[in-house]
Amino acid sequence: MNIFLDIFSFILFFGILTIISPILGKYMADIYEGRVHPSLKPIRYVEKTIYKILGIDESKEMNWKEYLYALLSFNFLGFLVLFLTLLFQKYLPLNQYHIPNMSWDLAFNTAVSFVTNTNWQAYAGETQATYFSQITGLALQNFLSAASGIVVALVLIRAFARKNTIYLGNFYVDFTRTILYVLLPVAFFSALFLVSQGVIQNFSHYKTIELLEPYKDSKNIITTQTLPMGPVASQEAIKLLGTNGGGFFNANSAHPFENPTPLSNVFEAFLIILIPASLVFTFGYMIKDKRQGWFLYSVMLFVLMLFMGIQYYFEWFGNPIVKKLGIEGPYLIGKELRFGIGGTVLFSSITTATSCGAVNSMLDSFTPLGGLVPMSLISLGEIIFGGVGSGLYGMIAMVIIAVFVAGLMIGRTPEYLNKKIESREMWSSVVITLVSGITALLLTTLALYTKWGLSSMSNPGPHGLSEVLYAYISTSNNSGSAFAGLNANTVFYNITTGLAMLIGRFIPIIAVFYMASSLSLKKHVPPSPGTLPTHTLVFGVWLVFIIIVVGALTFLPAFSLGPILEHMLMLEGVTL
């Protein structure tokens, strides 16, 4: 393991991202504006056939209420189908391992999780979900929930790009194009690459193999091991591309059947961040100001690399208690040796910044401040690239807040992208920014105040608090990753984390539509000498300041009692 090699790999990774994401962003802008390249005529034929079968008029656009109603209805139907599938999976096909039905609370939690693009997993995929549930339920929702997030971002983009109109697009058209032109093709070729790296793709029975080194437990000598099988590669690709994060196996992307090589690890991390980064450029192209796309990308990339550097430092130099025992080298507890510190930090930072939730390591085993980094990235509210779609509209809400505060300081009515920012936009932006944080803190308080919440904690002291806090920050921000020391498969946690996911997903979406309904009706205001430019270095510094301040004000007290206190105790050599 070499620090300089890791730094070089980070630079190469983000260099390639900076080259590819504008290209994909331009492609997506063309698709959503109806400019289909002649080479895509076969897909266009499929698209038209779908509209004909379903009776959809692609030329008819919707106002914000019609669009929102279609989106919410579609998501509710998806939840209902998935909930019933999990509740009765024992009786459905492709259940070679005779897996029983999920309990009602676990089925509710899992269905909500995948419909909201959170993919919080209170179950183990290899023992509690059948092949049928994985394919027709969970993998399907990986496509649908990702497309749902992207179309919400499209509505907000159009609200800025258009003027004096109530129409914001057609949900069914946007949704269909997202699936056909973006998610399916990229996921298909990504799955083929993952298979080439050793990710499995089959419908076989689980394999029983002889151990090379049998071992003895309290009762018997164990000589065999059962290896789970399944159609993993096809689900792995969309799990990452759609920033979903729910693994086929309980170990997620730390499992060698999901992520077998260092190359697959880098590729999977790239898949996670690809669409969130590209959508920023789609935004710039569709509003006819590419500078805005590059500006947002630069701010997001700066904050991500800052947090990555902090995490790398604490994980490389490790735990002083361990070093006192004469054990030198980087802190590898909870990490896969085939990835090392660099591959682990790259993956964990990207997956939490994008609110994906996939993990290639055990976050619960990181150093206190190393574990604070993913928690902090999630708690910023899905704005450092963020989930597909949700990251863009979350960042735009933060930009509007920054513009508003700057406008107050200079005594001008704030404007963003030639549109005046008034009470409706500010109200919506505040809701988008704060609702997940408030939800997480309230539910954490409830869990720590009740016996149902406390009974699931396996660790005392500040780390136990961190596990509970992380659970609700993760679910309310639709991330899905966890500090795994918490037993989340209880009625209390299944219901409360389910509510956190619903609130964190749909309240901001409603606020986005409310904002878009106002912006689309406004005319474009020509820039004046006093207009605040929102693509400059000065505004970038201001935006980063606002992002950090809002995040710190929301969670700093809770972080002080959790990971920060745990770090102080570690420096004193105290363990709990």
UniProtKB/Swiss-Prot annotation:
Return the InterPro entries for the record: KdpA
Source domain of life: Bacteria
Tell me which Pfam families the record gives: KdpA
Give the way it sits in the membrane. Answer: Multi-pass membrane protein
Q: Name one GO cellular component term.
A: plasma membrane
Would the keyword Cell membrane turn up in this protein's UniProt record?
yes
Record keywords, A-Z: Cell inner membrane, Cell membrane, Ion transport, Membrane, Potassium, Potassium transport, Transmembrane, Transmembrane helix, Transport
- Tell me where in or outside the cell this protein is found: Cell inner membrane
Key word DNA damage present in the record? no
Question: GO molecular-function annotation terms?
Answer: P-type potassium transmembrane transporter activity; potassium ion binding
Membrane spanning segments where? 3-23, 68-88, 137-157, 179-199, 267-287, 294-314, 339-359, 369-389, 391-411, 430-450, 495-515, 537-557
Assembly behavior: The system is composed of three essential subunits: KdpA, KdpB and KdpC.
Give the function comment from the record. Answer: Part of the high-affinity ATP-driven potassium transport (or Kdp) system, which catalyzes the hydrolysis of ATP coupled with the electrogenic transport of potassium into the cytoplasm. This subunit binds the periplasmic potassium ions and delivers the ions to the membrane domain of KdpB through an intramembrane tunnel.
PANTHER family xref list: POTASSIUM-TRANSPORTING ATPASE A CHAIN (PTHR30607), POTASSIUM-TRANSPORTING ATPASE POTASSIUM-BINDING SUBUNIT (PTHR30607:SF2)
Which HAMAP family does the record match to this protein? Answer: KdpA
Record-linked NCBIfam families = kdpA
- Family to which the UniProt record says this protein belongs: Belongs to the KdpA family.
Q: What is this protein called?
A: Potassium-transporting ATPase potassium-binding subunit
> Which source organism does the UniProt entry give?
Hydrogenobaculum sp. (strain Y04AAS1)
